[in-house]
């Protein structure tokens, strides 16, 4: 994949949603919660006012409505601004 986010944006691959509950109940796709955790795949160069803190390979937590979902080569990703990321874990 050859994609480079611009400015202060990052490309994140969301973690897989849970397939079943702790008690063993299988969760259908329509009822799955959107994951709030993912891996940073690529980062932009930042802006003159804001340096990029994130780097490729970081695992991050982000807000429920952060970014824009896209699909590349059959995989789902989210492009978001660095300040939409809540924490590095």
Swiss-Prot record:
UniProt GO molecular function: ATP binding; metal ion binding; protein folding chaperone; protein-folding chaperone binding; unfolded protein binding
UniProt keyword annotation of Isomerase present: no
SMART domains named among the record's database cross-references: Cpn10 (SM00883)
InterPro entries xrefs: Chaperonin_GroES, Chaperonin_GroES_sf, Chaprnonin_Cpn10_CS, GroES-like_sf
Membrane spanning residue stretches: none
Gene3D superfamilies to which the protein is assigned, alphabetical: GroES chaperonin (2.30.33.40)
Annotated disulfide bonds: none
Highest taxon, organism lineage: Bacteria
UniProtKB keywords: Chaperone, Cytoplasm
Annotated coiled-coil segments of the chain: none
UniProt cross-references to SUPFAM superfamilies, sorted A to Z: GroES-like (SSF50129)
Pfam families: Cpn10
Main location: cytoplasm
One of the record's GO cellular component terms: cytoplasm
UniProt KW Disulfide bond keyword: no
GO terms, biological process: chaperone cofactor-dependent protein refolding
Localization annotation: Cytoplasm
Quaternary state and interactors: Heptamer of 7 subunits arranged in a ring. Interacts with the chaperonin GroEL.
Family: Belongs to the GroES chaperonin family.
Its job: Together with the chaperonin GroEL, plays an essential role in assisting protein folding. The GroEL-GroES system forms a nano-cage that allows encapsulation of the non-native substrate proteins and provides a physical environment optimized to promote and accelerate protein folding. GroES binds to the apical surface of the GroEL ring, thereby capping the opening of the GroEL channel.
Xref: HAMAP family: CH10
Protein name, UniProt field: Co-chaperonin GroES
């Amino acid at each position: 994949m050859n994609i480079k986010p611009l400015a202060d944006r990052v490309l994140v691959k969301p973690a897989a949603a849970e397939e079943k509950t702790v008690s063993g109940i299988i969760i259908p796709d329509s009822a799955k919660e959107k994951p709030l955790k993912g891996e940073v795949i690529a980062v932009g160069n930042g802006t003159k006012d804001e340096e990029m803190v994130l780097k490729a390979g970081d695992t991050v937590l982000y807000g429920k409505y952060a970014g824009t979902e896209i699909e590349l080569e059959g995989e789902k990703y989210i492009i978001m601004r660095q300040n939409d990321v809540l924490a590095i874990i």
